[in-house]
Amino acid sequence: MPDQPLNRTTIPEKKLSNLPTCPGVYQFKNNQGTIIYVGKAKNIRSRVRSYFREGPHISGKTKVLVNHIADIDIILTSSEVEALILENNLIKDLKPRYNINLKDDKTYPYLVITNEAFPRILITRQVKRDGSTYFGPYTEARQLRSVLDLISTIFPVRKCKLKLTKENIESGRFSVCLNYHIHTCKGPCEGKQREEDYLRMIEEIKGLLKGKTGALIRTLSAEMHRYADELRFEEAAELKIQIEGLRKYTERQKVVSKDPVDRDVFGIAQHQDDACGVIFKIREGKLLGSQRMYFSNVDDEQHETLLRKCLEKYYLETPDLIPQEIFLPLPIDDDEVMALRELTGDINLRFIVPKIGEKAKLVAMCIDNARHHLEEYLIEKQKRGELSRIVPALQALQETLHLSRQPERIECFDNSHFQGTDYTSSMVCFVGGKPRKSDYRKFKLNSFEGSDDYAAMQEAVTRRYSGSLQDELPLPDLIVIDGGKGQVNTAWKVLQELGLEIPVIGLAKRLEEIFLPNTPDPYNLAKTSPALKLLQQIRDEAHRFAITYHRKLRTKRTIQTGLTDIAGIGEKSAMKLLEHFGSIEQIAKAEKEEILAVTGPKTAEAILSYFRKKQP
């Protein structure tokens, strides 16, 4: 069956047919005139028409996009590379809804060698097309510090901001600073260092930053020997220090390939709407570092599209670091290869998809790193999402309960007992809407006899807000009681007696009603209220903590009253038996062979003997 047209009623066939066949950028607009997608093409007409043809290659996201296209604008360029650069800039500026969003990496720093007489080496977060040479971005601050320390140690690069023109230097306008006297600068400001010597040093630094440490060491070694032969021992000694520093730096780099070819390795990982691309920079067989970039709004985009975005962005921003080979996890089309070769200025640049051996392992390692960084990114994204949920909940609590401030610290009490015995209370603490488990506390209650829920609450609140715990933990902004009117009033009275003005509320389970002290009628929050959802989360956590503690106490008492009386059985052995059989009754019914599966023959015999004596 031939391909069928999509959305042809919106975009007239005549308009599609009249589109030019040259390179450029196309912009899709919706019926409000908003640009919703930007793309680039070697042949605009062919590329745009492909969106309006039904077929297996059309993704769900593309179908949705096409259904929203009301108009098309184009911008012609002289080459596909110009189109690529323009597309990149337009996407950054316009952030169209249906484009893959590249997370802005402007927070990552670059090293820049300035385009001026006697260039300086600076850190910047903005890449400008000003003739300067940029290296980076450095996603790891430690890596950037390591490189800067190395350069400062072995290369006397000027650190001043002086405008060192030939006229300014010859006029004697400047004087050397402290850096000259401590031998970290050779004084070009006073003409003590020739510009050609300074620029030779800058080229050596560029070689270092490009990973050409082996070639640099060989060049410096030859120069050192020449100085020594010419009896210029001081200059030879300076070069020796530089060479030793370079060798130490090289030794710290991880060797990942036996052959000394310069390579970039790309890896991609995707999860639902997010993706991460990682690039390994390998120079002379050593891994110099890695860069990563994150994408959102990828939806059902194919990996080929994500890989293309990674390649384009990376080589747009780092045109001075082109390797001999680029390893990819999957192939890209020939047009993209040609565009990237034109972009980098290297028509011999090789794109390789390794299948076996060491090279394939490099790509696999890069993909593993992309997965790892994507997982970390998603965790952080989830945390940000939780924060965006928690802040409105805390604000709603403050407004609903008429609190003087936002309840940053909330403590919640829940009591537990078994048929009126083994009373316990748990207190959980939430700070900023999140559990702070280090501040959880549990209380074994024993100041009263029989079944008395109010006495239990009185003891728990008294013990928390008096004595050593009062000094050990900060006071909360809000106290939540798992209970109704009577429980809340009991807690409030204790606080009054202790002279504490802390807001306290109760949250009853059955109807999720909120009770305030000395107020007969409960307050009801909407079921969808973020404040109620946060209170429920805190209350449920207090209940979980209370039940866990109470169960542990009951188990311990069961052990002490039923098993530890048997010779040779301590608490650990008793716990092991209970975990295996489930109860003392089941242990009493067990055969010797069953008990031997858990303990030794002597202990098994003691258990059987103990329960025989208890039989009527």
UniProtKB/Swiss-Prot annotation:
Q: Where in the cell is it found?
A: Cytoplasm
Secretion signal, residue range per the UniProt entry: none
Q: Which GO terms describe its biological process?
A: nucleotide-excision repair; SOS response
Listed GO CC annotations: cytoplasm; excinuclease repair complex
Which GO MF terms does the UniProt record name? Answer: DNA binding; excinuclease ABC activity
Q: Which domain of life is it from?
A: Bacteria
The record's CDD domains line, in alphabetical order, gives: GIY-YIG_UvrC_Cho
Keywords in alphabetical order: Cytoplasm, DNA damage, DNA excision, DNA repair, Excision nuclease, SOS response
Domain UVR per the UniProt entry, residue ranges: 214-249
Please name the InterPro entries in this protein's record.
GIY-YIG_endonuc, GIY-YIG_endonuc_sf, GIY-YIG_UvrC_Cho, RuvA_2-like, UVR_dom, UVR_dom_sf, UvrABC_protein_C, UvrC
Q: Does the keyword Nucleotide-binding apply?
A: no
Determine if Membrane is one of this entry's keywords.
Answer: no
Task: Report domain GIY-YIG positions.
Answer: 21-100
In the record, the note on similarity to other proteins reads:
Belongs to the UvrC family.
Q: Quaternary state and partners of this protein? A: Interacts with UvrB in an incision complex.
What this chain does, per the entry, is described as: The UvrABC repair system catalyzes the recognition and processing of DNA lesions. UvrC both incises the 5' and 3' sides of the lesion. The N-terminal half is responsible for the 3' incision and the C-terminal half is responsible for the 5' incision.
Q: Which PANTHER family does the protein's record reference?
A: UVRABC SYSTEM PROTEIN C, UVRC/OXIDOREDUCTASE
**Can you name this protein?**
UvrABC system protein C
Specify the species. Prosthecochloris aestuarii (strain DSM 271 / SK 413)
